[in-house]
């Protein structure tokens, strides 16, 4: 008798994705972040739905409605801070997930990797429009500064900015449309996640050794469901610790002041997870150049499969590239720190050095290291 989960069409899809899925037997905890991102997305959609029930997307009442959620709605403060800190957890998992993909050479699964880049950009767009919604000082000025970057596009730039604003400045029309975008984008992300998984299950997962694992596969359930469950509990513990003890540690104090177009904050900066890209943007004195560098800082991920010339998948047996990888990680930490600092000496020069080294490591040094490692391997073959 065939198992019930192999008969019904919908159950068969679930079965082949999460139960009987053949999985490499040696994947480490670095492979947990995919499922954690799924949990983060679910938390964000659920908390966001409950917030949307009480939020009003009008410049006159947006700030007050967020205050009302925190003060008057049952557990509104909990939902609001789960949503705000859930976004931070989302990006922590996202950075670790991408970092693992680079370290273990998962970018060689081209379709999965490219859909992943589209997902990354969509999540960044969602987080940006979401940050505008509380209509605090940093929300307003962040929206003004970032949308204004589009004016650097030759010829159509200024018209495009006014079209996005829905007027001649960030105002009621902007807030309403940003709320609409923020509501719809998570569902687009969910659809993209399904496509991401579809392409992943076409090829099967990569593994730490970088070797073909077809001869050594185990079913996803119960082995990896239990393993993922442990990751979920750790994620929820960290998230609840943040929410209950330090809910505002990752936020900006300026956002507790209602938006005022007549008063500019001393230092306009985005949320911490955008600071690395913001630092790259600020390190170039030219406006259009800065915008291009900002876009390239993310799109450069698409160059990894093209620049890869190594005979091995992953960095496990590649000591030179490993050193470069950790240089890149340290570089991103420095960029994140610089993005939050004022535009003055010595921060500007540090930001410029870090920006140049970010692109140099990926485009010049890593391919050179791969060539050296290939030649060393030839000697010892």
From Swiss-Prot:
Entry's cofactor comment: Binds 2 heme b groups non-covalently.
Membrane topology: Multi-pass membrane protein
GO BP: mitochondrial electron transport, ubiquinol to cytochrome c
UniProt KW Transport keyword: yes
Binding site for a ubiquinone: 201
Segments passing through the bilayer: 33-53, 77-98, 113-133, 178-198, 226-246, 288-308, 320-340, 347-367
Residues bound to heme b b562: 83, 182
Domain of life: Eukaryota
Key words, A-Z: Electron transport, Heme, Iron, Membrane, Metal-binding, Mitochondrion, Mitochondrion inner membrane, Respiratory chain, Transmembrane, Transmembrane helix, Transport, Ubiquinone
Role description: Component of the ubiquinol-cytochrome c reductase complex (complex III or cytochrome b-c1 complex) that is part of the mitochondrial respiratory chain. The b-c1 complex mediates electron transfer from ubiquinol to cytochrome c. Contributes to the generation of a proton gradient across the mitochondrial membrane that is then used for ATP synthesis.
Descriptive protein name: Cytochrome b
Source organism: Sigmodon hispidus
Top-level taxonomy: Eukaryota, Metazoa, Chordata, Craniata, Vertebrata
Gene that encodes it: MT-CYB
């Amino acid at each position: 008798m065939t198992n019930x989960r192999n008969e019904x069409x919908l159950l068969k899809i679930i079965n082949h994705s999460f139960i009987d899925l053949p999985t490499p037997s040696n994947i480490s905890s670095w492979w947990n972040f995919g499922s954690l991102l799924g949990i983060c997305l679910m938390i964000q959609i659920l908390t966001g739905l409950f917030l949307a029930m009480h939020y009003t997307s009008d410049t006159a009442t947006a700030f007050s409605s967020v205050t009302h959620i925190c003060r008057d709605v049952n557990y509104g403060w909990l939902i609001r801070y789960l949503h705000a800190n859930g976004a931070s957890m989302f990006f922590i998992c996202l950075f670790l997930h991408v970092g693992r993909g680079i370290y273990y050479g998962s970018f060689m699964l081209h379709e999965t990797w490219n859909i992943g880049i589209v997902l990354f950009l969509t999540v960044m767009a969602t987080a940006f429009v979401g940050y505008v919604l509380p209509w605090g000082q940093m929300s307003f000025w962040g929206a003004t500064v970032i949308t204004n970057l589009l004016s650097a596009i030759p010829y159509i730039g200024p018209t495009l900015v006014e079209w996005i604003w829905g007027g001649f400045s960030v105002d009621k029309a902007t807030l309403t449309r940003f709320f609409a975008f923020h509501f719809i984008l998570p569902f687009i992300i969910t659809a993209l996640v399904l496509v991401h998984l579809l392409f992943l299950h076409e090829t099967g997962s990569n593994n730490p050794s970088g070797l073909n694992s077809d001869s050594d596969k185990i079913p996803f359930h119960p082995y990896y469901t239990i393993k993922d469950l442990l990751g979920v509990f750790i994620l929820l513990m960290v998230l609840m610790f943040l929410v209950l003890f330090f809910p505002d540690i990752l936020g900006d104090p300026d956002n507790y002041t209602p938006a005022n177009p007549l008063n500019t904050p001393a230092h306009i900066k985005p949320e911490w997870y955008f600071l690395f890209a913001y630092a790259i943007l600020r390190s170039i004195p030219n406006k259009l150049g800065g915008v291009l560098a900002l876009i390239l800082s993310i799109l450069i991920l698409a160059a990894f499969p093209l620049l890869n010339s190594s005979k091995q998948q992953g960095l496990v047996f590649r000591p030179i590239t490993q050193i470069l990888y950790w240089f890149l990680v340290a570089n991103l930490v420095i960029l994140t720190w610089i993005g939050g600092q004022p535009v003055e000496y010595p921060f500007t020069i540090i930001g410029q050095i870090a920006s140049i080294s970010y692109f140099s490591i990926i485009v010049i040094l890593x391919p050179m290291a791969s060539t050296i490692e290939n030649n060393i391997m030839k000697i010892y073959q």
